[in-house]
From Swiss-Prot:
It catalyses: L-glutamyl-tRNA(Gln) + L-glutamine + ATP + H2O = L-glutaminyl-tRNA(Gln) + L-glutamate + ADP + phosphate + H(+); L-aspartyl-tRNA(Asn) + L-glutamine + ATP + H2O = L-asparaginyl-tRNA(Asn) + L-glutamate + ADP + phosphate + 2 H(+). Pfam families: GatB_N (PF02934), GatB_Yqey (PF02637). This is Aspartyl/glutamyl-tRNA(Asn/Gln) amidotransferase subunit B. Its EC number is 6.3.5.-. The keyword Isomerase does not apply. Heterotrimer of A, B and C subunits. SUPFAM superfamilies: GatB/YqeY motif, Glutamine synthetase/guanido kinase. InterPro entries: Asn/Gln-tRNA_amidoTrfase_suB/E, Asn/Gln-tRNA_Trfase_suB/E_cat, Asn/Gln_amidotransferase, Asn/Gln_tRNA_amidoTrase-B-like, GatB, GatB_C_1, GatB_Yqey_C_2, Gln-tRNA_amidoTrfase_suB_CS. Transmembrane segments: none annotated. Keywords: ATP-binding, Ligase, Nucleotide-binding, Protein biosynthesis. The lineage of its organism: Bacteria, Bacillati, Bacillota, Bacilli, Lactobacillales.
Length: 477
């Protein structure tokens, strides 16, 4: 029997606010254990949560980016469960009145196939702390993450293949990234994904029994985990077995999903309205204010790059792969520089440097202004493309002005025939055999002489001018 795969995803996105959702403690990542905490995070008796308005702002922006309706009146709920990293023994979340509902997002597969995935809801909640199990036999709790604001985005079970799930995550990450509310870095935990997977015979409307899969810390691992889980369930069903409703975790070393626990239902959490956080009324003016503050989407930017700047679809997609690069590009072309040249540098030397140094654009000295200044120096013949690579490394490491560095380092390209001719004659004198070979009909000998000329000028000779002069002198030598 053949089965249809049914997949729904629950994605937690960490919001980039300076303070936590209900406490003034910092959300900064990477501090020593339990240093970014407050009495509210510790749940000391008598302390009360105070709502961070910026979290609701972010929630509205996310809902708008995902084409969702917004609950104009909403409240928070208590989700009750006990775990060491949850000192209150409950999590403040949203149950029946999420901030956003009835949304959708368009996905595109590698083969060009497009589909629309419905989004059931997006709700705000606080993150839990983190447990660490030491080699000394003790377990430790770090509450730095406790209270960090999250938005959980729950899709409908509209995906039918792991490839569609991968495409959905890609589209979702892009949509959230361009709102500016999160950096959505899965490898750093600011985007986390759980998957609900079930199979059903083709033609059957009712869903099969689902399993939840956790611990997928990269896009590729999501696909691997789903591939394994679909295959596992299919083998059980074909053998006449039954699927249990359970939670499983993905082991990225073995590529398998492993049983964690029997799956809980909503009733197990005993949701009820949070009495310490008041109901919020979201006005239409508030929503419109957030809508106006949203930057141009990646999709709109791609259309602008292709239709208005004459860039290729490939270039447009590469430039919008991250918002930081797209923002940098947009700033750079304001300096009246050829968009294609800026695009080439960002995709070429800049991308290679960032990859090799394991850094992001904001962490190096390159700016839209000094990059475009360097490109102009190439265009007007002040420096060669080869010299430009040296200039770029200097700008990336130390910042500053491209023009000032070129002058200070003596890198200005030599284009004056009066300067080049004596050097050419000296090259001829030192390479008489190559000159004789050229005059004897060996055209490649001239290339060797050009190479010697560039070496003699330390790469500063204008290649076009130098080559033209050299050939003229060879013919008259």
């Amino acid at each position: 029997m053949n089965f249809e795969t049914v997949i729904g995803l629950e994605v937690h996105v960490e919001l980039s606010t300076n303070s936590k959702i209900f406490s003034p403690a910092s959300t900064k990542f990477g501090g020593d254990p339990n240093t970014n905490t407050n009495v509210i995070d510790w749940s000391l008796p008598g302390v009360l949560p105070v709502m961070n308005k910026g979290v609701i702002d972010s929630g509205i922006k996310a809902a708008l980016a995902l084409n969702m309706d917004i609950h104009k009146s909403m409240h928070f709920d208590r989700k009750n469960y006990f775990y060491p990293d949850n000192p209150k023994a409950y999590q403040i979340s949203q149950f029946d009145e999420p901030i956003g509902y009835n949304g959708s997002i368009e996905i595109e597969l590698e083969d060009g196939h497009k589909a629309t995935i419905r989004i059931e809801r997006a709700h705000l909640e606080e993150d839990a702390g983190k447990n660490t199990h030491g080699t000394d036999g003790y377990s430790y709790v770090d509450l730095n993450r406790q209270g960090v604001p999250l938005i959980e985005i729950v899709s409908e079970a509209d995906m039918r293949t792991p490839e569609e799930a991968y495409a959905y995550l890609t589209a979702l990450k892009e949509a959230i990234l361009y709102t500016g509310i999160s950096d959505v870095k899965m490898e750093e935990g600011s985007m986390r994904c759980d998957a609900n997977v079930s199979l059903r015979p083709y033609g059957q409307e009712a869903f099969g029994v689902k399993t939840e899969v956790k611990n997928m810390n990269s896009f590729s691992n999501v696909k691997k985990a789903l591939d394994f889980e679909v295959d596992r369930q299919a083998k059980i069903l074909r053998a006449g077995g039954e699927i249990r409703q359970e939670t499983r975790r993905f082991n990225d070393k073995t590529g398998e999903t492993i049983l964690m626990r029997v799956k809980e239902g909503a009733s197990d959490y005993r949701y009820f309205p949070e009495p310490d956080v008041p109901r919020f009324e979201i006005s239409e003016e508030w929503v419109e204010q957030m809508r106006e503050s949203l930057p141009m989407t990646a999709k709109a930017r791609r259309a602008h790059y292709i239709n208005d700047l004459a860039l290729s679809d490939y270039d447009a997609r590469q430039l919008t792969a991250t918002k930081e690069v797209s923002d940098f590009f947009d700033q750079a072309i304001k300096f009246d520089t050829d968009p294609k040249l800026v695009s080439n540098w960002l995709q070429g030397e800049v991308a290679q440097y960032l990859n090799s140094e394991k850094k992001e654009l904001h962490e190096i000295g390159l700016t839209p202004e000094n990059l475009t200044e360097m490109i102009r120096l190439i265009s007007d013949g002040t420096i060669s493309s080869k010299i430009a690579k040296k200039v770029f490394i200097e700008l990336a490491k130390n910042g500053g002005s491209a023009e000032e560095f070129v002058k200070k380092a003596g890198l200005v390209q030599i284009s004056d025939p009066a300067v080049l001719l004596p050097i050419i004659h000296d090259v001829f004198a030192k390479n008489e055999q190559s000159v004789a070979d050229y005059r004897g009909g060996k055209q490649n000998a001239a290339k060797a002489l050009v190479g010697q000329l560039m070496k003699a000028t330390k790469g500063q000779a204008n290649p076009t001018v130098a080559q033209k002069l050299l050939y003229q002198e060879l013919d008259n030598f």
